[in-house]
Amino acid sequence: MIWHVQNENFILDSTRIFMKAFHLLLFDGSFIFPECILIFGLILLLMIDSTSDQKDIPWLYFISSTSLVMSITALLFRWREEPMISFSGNFQTNNFNEIFQFLILLCSTLCIPLSVEYIECTEMAITEFLLFVLTATLGGMFLCGANDLITIFVAPECFSLCSYLLSGYTKKDVRSNEATMKYLLMGGASSSILVHGFSWLYGSSGGEIELQEIVNGLINTQMYNSPGISIALIFITVGIGFKLSLAPSHQWTPDVYEGSPTPVVAFLSVTSKVAASASATRIFDIPFYFSSNEWHLLLEILAILSMILGNLIAITQTSMKRMLAYSSIGQIGYVIIGIIVGDSNGGYASMITYMLFYISMNLGTFACIVLFGLRTGTDNIRDYAGLYTKDPFLALSLALCLLSLGGLPPLAGFFGKLHLFWCGWQAGLYFLVSIGLLTSVVSIYYYLKIIKLLMTGRKQEITPHVRNYRGSPLRSNNSIELSMIVCVIASTILGISMNPIIAIAQDTLF
């Protein structure tokens, strides 16, 4: 008798939960239509994989890419609509969130063709790889639109769990296993620190979890200048600093970059920074509105450390992926300038513009590294010597992307940094901008050092890897070259036509 009562209660509770979920999707589902497209793509992937054979592998790539393109299209149709809050205040749709979601989808769309040949050569499991990439993309999109502390914590964990699995995807590689372990342990620690900061914010605001309601709660409780808010700020900054690879929370980055499969590194190097930047902007600007001087100072210190350490240590690296890891630490220091400047002086617009340029520059560089690695089996910078004599197209593409990362005119990286630094200078961040300019000069040195190696024609400097260089026999290499060409063109010409991009970025609102 007792068992029957408990069973009936369980069925009733389950029915209520299901009906509530159905009600939310029915009335609020239109607000997450781009995300629903990705979810449908994930289900379709699993269905095809469970009912098909090896001949249907191209369909898996097609479904993944089509889902991402359709999601981008849905986002573009929703552009300029009125800001809306849905799912009982958990999710917000506005232009600011959507432009970051667009950047994440763009990253994933370019990363899938970049991965095709690598997966075939290394015989990695295709369905699981695409599943993790799409799920991580979904987590990043939900993070961009998150409007409460719970969603801001759960969404990046969805992204992080997929990132841990992707970084250790080549299970037989010892370096990949080491990278996964370090990433998992430090990621878990940073998440604990982040949620501890959220608990202080929750308690200080009188039990509020929505970002705007936290501000109102702090006013009502008169806790906006309390020590609890300072403690929350420190813990949250440390947690977000890990996600952004800000110094001194950057130690995991070089090892994960070096040990993970190269297409995975390409994916993580841009999507994680885009999603974390969107989240950081809203967290610092809304709940910590009354502590703007404190978080400005804190972020300035971290940005200076990142720019100096990242670019100086990058000079000493012998691995291309480790060099790009330290370079990315320096690059995120430049992005922080836009977050500190804020919306009043065009800081957010300059940050978004530079993020778009960084995606093209970074993914273009990684596409070149994937191609070179598949054809030579090496990642050592020294082994790139003389590549121009064997593959001029690949060498020139890599050189253009590196020059753009360094910020040399007339490439996109130059105009992106120029606008970012100019906004910082107008906002009075003279010391921070000066450090940014000096470290940019340092970065040009190690990029030019690689380009000099690429173009060398002296036989004694050319290593056996380039001497025995061969083109890939696989027909799928066109997909990598397609991603590479798109990124190289974007890295070259986007800067010239950046005024429309800035105008679109300035149209973003919270």
Swiss-Prot record:
A GO molecular function for this record?
NADH dehydrogenase (ubiquinone) activity
Does the keyword section mention Phosphoprotein? Answer: no
Listed GO biological process terms = ATP synthesis coupled electron transport; photosynthesis, light reaction
Q: Which cysteines are disulphide-bonded?
A: none
- Can you say where in the cell this protein is located? Plastid, Chloroplast thylakoid membrane
Pfam families, per the entry: Ndh2_N, Proton_antipo_M
Keyword Translocase appears in the UniProt entry = yes
EC annotation?
7.1.1.-
Membrane spanning residue stretches: 24-44, 57-77, 99-119, 124-144, 149-169, 183-203, 227-247, 295-315, 323-343, 354-374, 395-415, 418-438, 484-504
Listed InterPro entries: NADH-Q_OxRdtase_suN/2, ND/Mrp_TM, Ndh2_N
GO cellular component annotations of the record? chloroplast thylakoid membrane
Kindly give the membrane topology term recorded for this protein: Multi-pass membrane protein
Q: Which UniProt keywords apply?
A: Chloroplast, Membrane, NAD, NADP, Plastid, Plastoquinone, Quinone, Thylakoid, Translocase, Transmembrane, Transmembrane helix, Transport
Recorded catalytic reaction(s): these are:
a plastoquinone + NADH + (n+1) H(+)(in) = a plastoquinol + NAD(+) + n H(+)(out); a plastoquinone + NADPH + (n+1) H(+)(in) = a plastoquinol + NADP(+) + n H(+)(out)
Q: Which PANTHER family match?
A: NADH DEHYDROGENASE
Q: Which family does it belong to?
A: Belongs to the complex I subunit 2 family.
Cited function: NDH shuttles electrons from NAD(P)H:plastoquinone, via FMN and iron-sulfur (Fe-S) centers, to quinones in the photosynthetic chain and possibly in a chloroplast respiratory chain. The immediate electron acceptor for the enzyme in this species is believed to be plastoquinone. Couples the redox reaction to proton translocation, and thus conserves the redox energy in a proton gradient.
Q: How does it assemble?
A: NDH is composed of at least 16 different subunits, 5 of which are encoded in the nucleus.
Per its record, how is this protein called by name? NAD(P)H-quinone oxidoreductase subunit 2 A, chloroplastic
Originating organism: Citrus sinensis
Gene for this chain: ndhB1
